[in-house]
């Protein structure tokens, strides 16, 4: 039934630092303590490299040169290895209580991947999933994913390359996957595709694959 769909509030944060993004995610995570407060935080970050928690710490000898490029470096409580966030990248942090959807982290990640594949398709880019996490166009990753889930409340999420400066990725092995590259909507379509243009496609696909209603404050 239409009325039984979960309601998810879309929050557009604009350009915010990675640290501020972490702080705001925690604010929305905490709101779930008093009841369902499903939220979808959308933002862009200034240049920043982030590492996950499930693997060996990235050595300082490899992090310091990244700071010299003018980027911040942070360790986050998400899965995955090192990746880059920066302007021109649509970052989406779903803060959902999976009890209101399906209490399965595997299902959740699969729905995120389907969401991005559909969004890319509606823009004219044929993207796929692979044994590696994220969404790909051939051997090039167009969207990175890394999530955290505590007591079935999600945080962190995905980063879709729209018109990102891809040269930032040349200084790392994105997500620790050797022999693979990165791409963007702009590169694939050979025209400029902004975060503003891509956002409604991602939101429509999210509502479809998570079977939810999206709302925004006027």
Q: Would you name each region that the model predicts?
A:
Residues 1-137, 141-142, 193:
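N-terminal lobe of the biotin/lipoate ligase/transferase fold
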Residues 2-4, 10-13, 100-143, 147-218:
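Long, positively charged amphipathic alpha-helical accessory segments at protein N-termini or as interdomain linkers
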């Amino acid at each position: 039934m239409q009325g039984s769909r979960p309601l998810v509030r879309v929050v557009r944060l604009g350009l915010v630092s990675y640290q501020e993004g972490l702080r705001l995610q925690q604010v929305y995570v905490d709101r779930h303590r008093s009841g369902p407060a499903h939220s979808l935080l959308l933002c862009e970050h200034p240049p920043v490299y982030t590492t996950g928690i499930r693997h060996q710490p990235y050595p300082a000898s490899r992090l310091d040169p990244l700071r010299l490029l003018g980027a911040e470096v942070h360790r986050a409580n998400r899965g995955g290895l090192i990746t880059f966030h920066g302007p021109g990248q649509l970052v989406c942090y779903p803060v959902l209580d999976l009890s209101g959807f399906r209490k399965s982290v595997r299902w959740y990640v699969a729905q995120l991947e389907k969401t991005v594949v559909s969004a890319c398709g509606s823009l004219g880019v044929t993207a796929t999933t692979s044994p590696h996490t994220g969404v790909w166009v051939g051997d090039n990753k167009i969207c990175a994913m890394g999530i955290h889930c505590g007591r079935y409340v999600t945080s962190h999420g995905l980063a879709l390359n729209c018109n990102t400066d891809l040269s930032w990725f040349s200084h790392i092995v994105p997500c620790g996957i050797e022999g693979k590259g990165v791409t963007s909507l702009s590169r694939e379509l050979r025209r400029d595709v902004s975060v503003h243009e891509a956002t409604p496609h991602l939101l429509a696909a999210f509502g479809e694959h998570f079977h939810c209603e999206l709302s925004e404050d006027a």
